[in-house]
Amino acid sequence: MSSAKTRLFLTIEKLKNSMDDPQMTYPFWEKFFPLLGNSTTITLELSTLSEMINEAAETAEQLIVTQGGVVYSQYVQNATNTSGTNNNMVNRRLLVPPISTATPVLQPLEIKKYHNFAEKIASYFVSASVQSSMYTVKDVVKLYLYLSHLPKFKPLFSLLEEALFTKQRNCVPAVTSDKLILILDNLRDLTVITNFRLDNEAVSLMLNNIQIVLNNELSKYPVVKVKDFISTSNVYEKEVEPFKAFGDKFELLVAQKSSHLVLSSENTLLFNSNPIIVENIAASIEYNCDINRMVYNSINNIFINSVEQSAAENIKFDVDDYNRRYRVLDRIRENLRNNYIEKVAVGDISSKKRITNNPTTIPPITLKKRRTSNLLIED
């Protein structure tokens, strides 16, 4: 039995024991048996899968309630001997270790290194509408640690502690006048703000901002910000002609500075001395790829993007003007009707009359180094 089948068997065994189903009476167990043999796929209905998930969830909930009651009872009774509990919880770890009678030694907190962070974040929360400051989650933690370890900031810490257990949509807790005076004194000592008055409105603003920060969900993945190509600066209020929009875009490109420069002399591929390289690459692409489909998809994507860009920037879309970009296709069709073929390599064009099509497996014809552009060679 392979390792994957062994893990599957152990998982099924663990689930059925946890769900108190040693005889496998549930109908969904047999659905996984083919995977223990030679089968690599199974057909599992959504209703069967939902039933298994629901049964497992109910069993897990009952197990959590049972273990939670045992742990809570142990915690309340302050039991030091857990032999009876261990007998009921075989092969299970205690969620809360036994409470020891020894008093733990608390490490002193270095208040000085937390002061600057606490002052910065408190000033931001009190005056968020006046100034802006960058902060992180650790700054909020430092604020709570700093206030909790100084007795003189106890009124302010008690107020901020309530925000830890308050949802964002709940009302801001009411503060009595006596407590408000003490809280404002704490804010004046902590923030040293003198450019505006600290009053009840400042306290409400601080609580509101604290609740927003504490109830903000942390993203599982990093947030990637992509600069939009379409912004308010390049959107016209009224519909404009395409040539006007192209002219404006060209002015923006001219104003930009080049970030790097590549000299053509650094090119190591000397196509002029050996043009057969280009011919072999073209033959390989034609043999392995569907050129017609590639060209069709490219033109289709360019058309869709052009229409969306014109609609987003309020630019008039002229079909006839757009089709001028593909007039080269008309020349190709005309040459096909006249039984001519053009071969392009290294900037030169040579034409010859087509008699038979060369198979794709035969290497292309080697072009001469010295050729005359637009010269018609008849066989």
Curated annotation (Swiss-Prot):
The protein's matches in InterPro entries, at most eight in alphabetical order, are given as: AcMNPV_C42
Give a single Pfam family match: AcMNPV_Orf101
Q: What is this protein called?
A: Uncharacterized protein in P7.3 3'region
Organism lineage reads as: Viruses, Viruses incertae sedis, Naldaviricetes, Lefavirales, Baculoviridae
